[in-house]
Amino acid sequence: MEFDGEAQAVEPTSRMLSWARNSALYRLQQRMMTEKQLRDAIMRKAREKFEDIGPAQVKALGEFAVTFAYGIKALDDTAYAEITVRSGQRSGKSKRGLAQKLQIKGVARETATAALQETNDLVAAVIFARKRAFGPYRRVEPDEKRKAKEFSAFARNGFSFEIGAKVMAMTTEEAEDILSDAPL
């Protein structure tokens, strides 16, 4: 492909590679990322930073950054999935919601499934109810409108109707027993 008589370069320059390495280091120091997130971020920023960069160079920079990150052991999708799942469970996120989040972040289905095996939707639902003052943690007597609102909130957050009904029917003591027995 030619633009204005010049052939588009296929290989990234040493300046581009150095920038990709430094940018990957900076991003991974700021937060834990998946392989897909790092590749996409480097490719997006490379298009912004370098004016005459071609699609092949952009892709090569993304791959270089990912390879570099794996080389220094700063990128690990399995650890990312496990940490995300544990954090989500502690904050009351459903297994379904966590699976969707991992899929969006680009974690492989097998890795996400392995990380999600230890999760317990009942524990997460009780935590969610405690955060929102639903079910056993309700401060006022519910009317039908309030119950419908609470069931809707459970459903929107990925919990099944059965789990929502189970949590809504619990006493505070039963809910606290579930939380005390749960490994968080």
From Swiss-Prot:
- Gene Ontology annotations for the cellular component aspect, listed alphabetically: cytoplasm
Instruction: Mention one GO biological process in which this protein takes part, according to its record.
Output: regulation of DNA repair
Q: Which key words tag this protein in UniProt?
A: Cytoplasm
> Which cell locations does it reside in?
Cytoplasm
> What Pfam families does the database record attribute to this sequence?
RecX_HTH2
What InterPro entries would the database entry show? Answer: RecX_HTH_2nd, Regulatory_RecX, WH-like_DNA-bd_sf
The principal location of this protein is cytoplasm
Primary role: Modulates RecA activity.
Q: Which family does it belong to?
A: Belongs to the RecX family.
Mind telling me what this protein is named? Regulatory protein RecX
* Species: Agrobacterium fabrum (strain C58 / ATCC 33970)
Taxonomy of the source species? Bacteria, Pseudomonadati, Pseudomonadota, Alphaproteobacteria, Hyphomicrobiales
The gene from which this protein is expressed is: recX
